Amino acid sequence: MTIRNHTLGFPRVGLRRELKKAQESYWAGNATREDLLATGRELRARHWDQQKQAGIDLLPVGDFAWYDHVLTTSLLLGNVPARHQNSDGSVDIDTLFRIGRGRAPTGEPAAAAEMTKWFNTNYHYMVPEFVKGQQFKLTWTQLLDEVDEALALGHKVKPVLLGPVTYLWLGKVKGESFDRLSLLNDILPVYKQVLTELAKRGVEWVQIDEPALVLELPQEWLDAYKPAYDALQGQVKLLLTTYFEGVTPNLDTIAALPVQGLHVDLVHGKDDVAELHKRLPSDWLLSAGLVNGRNVWRADLTEKYAQIKDIVGKRDLWVASSCSLLHSPIDLSVETRLDAEVKSWFAFALQKCGELALLRDALNSGDTAKLEAWSAPIQARRHSTRVHNAAVEKRLAAITAQDSQRASPYAARAQAQRNRFNLPSWPTTTIGSFPQTTEIRGLRLDFKKGNLDANHYRTGIAEHIKQAIVEQERLGLDVLVHGEAERNDMVEYFGEHLDGFVFTQNGWVQSYGSRCVKPPVVIGDVSRPEPITVEWAKYAQSLTDKPVKGMLTGPVTILCWSFPREDVSRETIAKQIALALRDEVADLEAAGIGIIQIDEPALREGLPLRRSDWDAYLQWGVEAFRINAAVAKDDTQIHTHMCYCEFNDIMDSIAALDADVITIETSRSDMELLESFEEFEYPNEIGPGVYDIHSPNVPSVEWIEALLNKAAQRIPAERLWVNPDCGLKTRGWPETRAALANMVKAAQNLRQA
């Protein structure tokens, strides 16, 4: 029984973000469709070859996506919302982009599909929409075309397909209500057709992803798996693939399925290998996800070897990444600025492929010498002075309940804040960032490269902040922001100014569509050596009589959007960050900043996948936010912002944050999210987003008024704020001005109504 290795998927964007550049060039009309398709072909060929050269036996095909793999699956099934459909029913790459970006075939605006987090990762998928009586048919053959491509290049392939039950679970019903699970029998024929086509091509194994099997699914969804896979069996061998959690709670359901193998995440799950071996059919292949696909740390391969060695020779075994390497940067070797010691602790996607090759070879030969050599740096790290800071650990241990309590309850604070700011009804504001123009990005890049001295850089940033203030005053906004010209990314910026973080040059990972992020890495205890945001906030406030918000990224979001340490708990990291940012709140307040926004868009996405684990997480997540904010005086207004959120199941925790104002993303869901706040009788102020900043569409005054009137049916108008869904960093100034002008006009109309 020779052990083989494989990956569940590979990053799509390219080492230099070639896919992003090609997409954006095509969207701007500066490149042809053939240019775009050629970039995709080049990236796929390169990535297959790189994995093969690194020692991967079976290459994933179908993991590449032009925007998102769930959206690709929707097109495969012919599931295109009516507003995005071509008149002749055909589907092309522009159809796909219209769904993701919000356009009708005519070029007119049409709402983009809703976007939400892919399980508990930082990747976003486009939510499939289902309507009653919907028809499905094989419409988009990208998977088959790419399999042909890989086979022509001589590769051993393992096609990747999002499974039918998970696909339905991830979607939403639109229009008349019905049970979306009832569509299962309608999509299965398309899946069968795809598997038949793959079998014709000589494919032996298909990776069919069913990550929903790690969740606490309703019984009727669990029961749907057996008939679904009964219908799909017989064409090719199916590797039922799960990730992000363990499968033990649903193992009885899984073991009864007519598949030939199971992939389990042995990094994030608590599954016991011996129990899996005992309970799974003896003729099944077990794919052991031993190398973490969603972090940057080098694996201790001696530990991984020990974890799996007892079942070697007892069943067919593959070793694999825990999940797709989509969530990891591509190649550590191009990182030339990382300190040698720190660099020795890391492994990116290509290095993880190398780890899988080392592990496979050791398990096949029994010789662990290379594993021991590979693991030595990560073992030495445990004693590094770069990791431990006694002062931080002491401060964390001294936290009391008082440290997370504001001085007075909300009602008293609200009165103090009204007296201080005297804002009109329907106060208008934005979420924080303004367009990051080529000029701004060039300024930061020149400074970073050493082509610009600090004085010239600061003069340039000050000018952009001044412009942002002038623009906002001209538009008539009530509460202003400085625009964040100095910030490349809302998490990276703070990480750069906190001890305990390091940064990469090319550690890009895809967030959604063409958007990539470069998460910082938490390598040690976190502290703040000096104030971070105070100087620019103070400068912006000096330019206007209107209040300017101080802008902080909250502790849970910094944690969730960074690559965390693996040697301490997430709670410990979050509270260390909270203590550092608590000092920033105190310094902003002392500098005369009266409104401070602490963004926590990631609070919900950090939830464990199993509901039974939620309470413990929410308890420390809320406490971290409160530690961060509670130092503020009563007349300092604390705002928070959240996006991509379903709130109804965590309303207690949202209220427990005790923020004076919460702004939320609601426009894509047509204010549906406010229902949660209404039912809960949420006591504090709320700013429901009135337009979608992920789309270039400019909302009309009437559209915004209609949304605000809808909001006022659920939340008393005196507690409503008016704002976009999210920051405006990715937009251009022309559409930003137009959209905000309409937003301000809508608020003014409502004040006069």
From Swiss-Prot:
The record's catalysed reaction(s) read: 5-methyltetrahydropteroyltri-L-glutamate + L-homocysteine = tetrahydropteroyltri-L-glutamate + L-methionine
Q: Where is the signal peptide?
A: none
According to its UniProt record, in which pathway does this protein act? Amino-acid biosynthesis; L-methionine biosynthesis via de novo pathway; L-methionine from L-homocysteine (MetE route): step 1/1
Gene3D superfamilies, alphabetically? 3.20.20.210
- Per the Swiss-Prot or TrEMBL record, the active site comprises H694 (proton donor)
EC nos: 2.1.1.14
The EC category is transferase
Q: Identify the keywords attached in UniProt to this record, alphabetized.
A: Amino-acid biosynthesis, Metal-binding, Methionine biosynthesis, Methyltransferase, Repeat, Transferase, Zinc
> What does the record's cofactor remark say about binding?
Binds 1 zinc ion per subunit.
Q: Which cofactor does it need?
A: Zn(2+)
Q: Which residues are involved in binding Zn(2+)?
A: H641, C643, E665, C726
Top-level taxon: Bacteria
What are the binding positions for L-methionine in this chain? I431, G432, S433, E484, D599
CDD domains to which the protein is assigned, alphabetical: CIMS_C_terminal_like, CIMS_N_terminal_like
Keyword DNA damage found: no
Residues binding 5-methyltetrahydropteroyltri-L-glutamate are R17, E18, L19, K20, K117, R515, C516, W561, E605
Give GO terms: molecular function aspect only. Answer: 5-methyltetrahydropteroyltriglutamate-homocysteine S-methyltransferase activity; zinc ion binding
- Cell wall biogenesis/degradation as a keyword of this entry, yes or no, is no
Biological processes, Gene Ontology terms: methionine biosynthetic process; methylation
Extract the PANTHER family matched here.
Answer: 5-METHYLTETRAHYDROPTEROYLTRIGLUTAMATE--HOMOCYSTEINE METHYLTRANSFERASE
The record's family statement is: Belongs to the vitamin-B12 independent methionine synthase family.
Q: Know the name of this protein? A: 5-methyltetrahydropteroyltriglutamate--homocysteine methyltransferase
Tell me what gene encodes this.
Answer: metE
